């Protein structure tokens, strides 16, 4: 294990917000990071930014005090996926994900690849059904059950493989907590504060609704990154969550 490893998998902040850092420009992404407090959120680096700027972007965010969710959705043969997950752990990310449809052998190999990292291993979660997909999209690829049924099936498989949780729609959260237990982490995209544009997400929910449903970490992008005052927007969302919890 290298000195790049930054935090243990429990993380060090209590905020449930993960901001999707979806920029095509590194300077713009870092400028955004400099405008928000790392105690208020974690940051998600996805395929576009990681392809453009690589591991150094993650290191730059770590240097600013942020915990990073590396959202690359690995889906390959077991050995290749395991090596990729181990590389993410070496980089020191807080969370990394794979596609549950890669199957039991792939997910088990990924989990075993993190054993040498002990308490410093990132959270390992699996993607169930993309929040942009509805029943028609599933039928197009030969899956003739509802998104909720498919998400539950894949969440059970993920739990059986010993992973930490799944990426899912907030609409499946209550059921998945019942099936997989309270310790099974639920990470949900498609979260939009009241009044925000839904964008390309079809199955959306507000932050307050997501927390009430049992979501552990909510991914929010443009409503925060495109805000004139992203730090205020973050604070407002956190305040609404605290108010809703009372």
UniProtKB/Swiss-Prot annotation:
CDD domains: OMP_decarboxylase_like
PROSITE patterns: OMPDECASE (PS00156)
Keyword annotations: Decarboxylase, Lyase, Pyrimidine biosynthesis
Organism: Yersinia enterocolitica serotype O:8 / biotype 1B (strain NCTC 13174 / 8081)
Residues annotated as transmembrane: none
Entries under InterPro entries matching the protein: Aldolase_TIM, OMPdecase, OMPdecase_AS, OMPdecase_bac, OMPdeCOase_dom, RibuloseP-bd_barrel
GO terms assigned for molecular function: orotidine-5'-phosphate decarboxylase activity
Enzymatic reactions: orotidine 5'-phosphate + H(+) = UMP + CO2
GO cellular component, one term: cytosol
Pathways involved: Pyrimidine metabolism; UMP biosynthesis via de novo pathway; UMP from orotate: step 2/2
Signal peptide: none
Active site positions: 73
Membership in a protein family: Belongs to the OMP decarboxylase family. Type 1 subfamily.
Protein name: Orotidine 5'-phosphate decarboxylase
Known partners and oligomeric status: Homodimer.
């Amino acid at each position: 294990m290298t000195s790049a490893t930054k935090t243990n998998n429990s993380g060090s902040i209590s905020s449930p917000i993960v901001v999707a850092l979806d920029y095509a420009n590194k300077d713009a992404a870092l400028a955004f990071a400099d405008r928000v407090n790392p105690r208020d959120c974690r940051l998600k680096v996805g395929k576009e930014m990681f392809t453009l700027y690589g591991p150094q972007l993650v290191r730059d965010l770590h240097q600013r005090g942020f915990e990073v969710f590396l959202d690359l959705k690995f889906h390959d043969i077991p050995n290749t996926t395991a090596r990729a997950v181990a590389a993410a752990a070496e980089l020191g990310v807080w969370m990394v994900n794979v596609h549950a449809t890669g199957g039991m052998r792939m997910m088990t190999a990924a989990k075993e690849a993190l054993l040498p990292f002990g308490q410093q291993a990132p959270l390992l979660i699996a993607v169930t059904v993309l929040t942009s997909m509805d029943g028609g999209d599933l039928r197009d690829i030969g899956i003739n059950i509802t998104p909720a049924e498919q998400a539950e099936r894949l969440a059970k498989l993920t739990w059986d493989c010993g992973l930490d949780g799944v990426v899912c729609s907030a609409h499946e959260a209550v059921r998945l907590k019942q099936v997989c237990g309270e310790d099974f982490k639920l990470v949900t995209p498609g979260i939009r504060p009241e009044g925000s544009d839904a964008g390309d997400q079809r199955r959306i929910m507000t932050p307050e609704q997501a927390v009430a449903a049992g979501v552990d970490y909510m991914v929010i992008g443009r409503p925060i990154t495109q805000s004139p005052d992203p730090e205020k927007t973050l604070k407002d969302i956190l305040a609404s969550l605290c108010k809703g919890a009372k």
